Regions:
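Gly-rich Lys/Arg/Thr-decorated short loops/hinges at beta-loop-alpha junctions or inter-strand turns
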Residues: 11-22, 47-49, 83-92, 112-120, ...
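Acidic, Ser/Thr-rich peripheral helices and adjacent loops at domain boundaries
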Residues: 98-110, 187
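Short helix/loop capping segments that flank catalytic or ligand/cofactor-binding pockets
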Residues: 38, 60-62, 91-93, 180-182
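Glycine/aspartate-rich loop-and-adjacent alpha/beta segment that forms the canonical ThDP
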Residues: 108, 126-187
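Secondary-structure transition/capping motifs at alpha-helix termini
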Residues: 43-47, 70-79, 110-115, 158-167
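Cofactor-binding active-site loop characterized by glycine-rich and histidine/acidic residues
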Residues: 1-74
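A short, conserved beta-to-alpha structural element at the edge of catalytic cores
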Residues: 23-24, 73-100
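Acidic, glycine-rich active-site loops and adjacent beta-strand->loop/helix elements
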Residues: 53-60, 84-90, 123-125, 175-177
């Protein structure tokens, strides 16, 4: 019964499933998860509140403008950490930011007040010779996969420390959807 309150028609826009978004829930098409993270950060300034964001909705202005508005209002609150999964695809089409290069993506976040942008690009670790800007890390050999995984873990650790130390920070992980539901790209 509780889930009925959170369905799109009478509850949170974009949550058709009725699942109540948590702090680590994906941001969804209009970035609801990020608002829970920002609220948590405001209320509990000694804890980190990460939220995941997919690039499928990043073409919408709401996600980054909400971060910028929040930072303008509460510049001292930086203990929330967006983690962007940048894979070039929405569920059914290319994402609006799929044609950006790394420098443009970094500039996009910096334009919205993010002082530190930590971008981990799987392409930098590709030992399988994949073409295109987005590569599938599940095709890497063992050493390349370990190096990429290490870079992600170290990047997230550095980002967490940065966010908890008063610097507005984002982590961006750039790789093709390669495993799970999307066996190859976003087919």
């Amino acid at each position: 019964q509780l889930q009925e309150r959170f369905r799109e028609r009478d509850g949170l826009l974009g949550h058709l499933s009725g699942a109540i978004p948590g702090l680590l829930a994906p941001a969804g098409p209009l970035g609801q998860g990020q608002h829970f993270a920002m609220a948590g950060a405001y209320l509990h300034r000694d804890r980190l509140f990460p939220c995941t964001i997919g690039d499928g909705g990043l073409g919408e202005p709401y996600i980054l403008s909400a971060f910028k508005h929040f930072h303008t209002s509460y510049p001292e609150v930086t203990n929330f950490l967006p983690v962007l999964i940048w894979n070039g695809f929405s569920q059914e089409h290319h994402s609006m930011v799929s044609l950006m290069d790394n420098e443009q993506m970094v500039a996009y976040w910096r334009a919205h007040d993010f002082e530190r942008v930590i971008l981990i690009d799987a392409k930098d670790y590709d030992d399988a010779g994949q073409e295109g800007a987005y590569v599938d890390s599940t095709r890497f050999g063992p050493e390349a996969r370990r190096a990429f995984t290490r870079a992600v873990l170290e990047g997230v650790k550095a980002a967490a420390d940065s966010a908890l130390s008063g610097t507005l920070t984002v982590v961006i992980v750039k790789q093709l959807k390669g495993a799970g539901v999307h066996a190859q790209g976003a087919k």
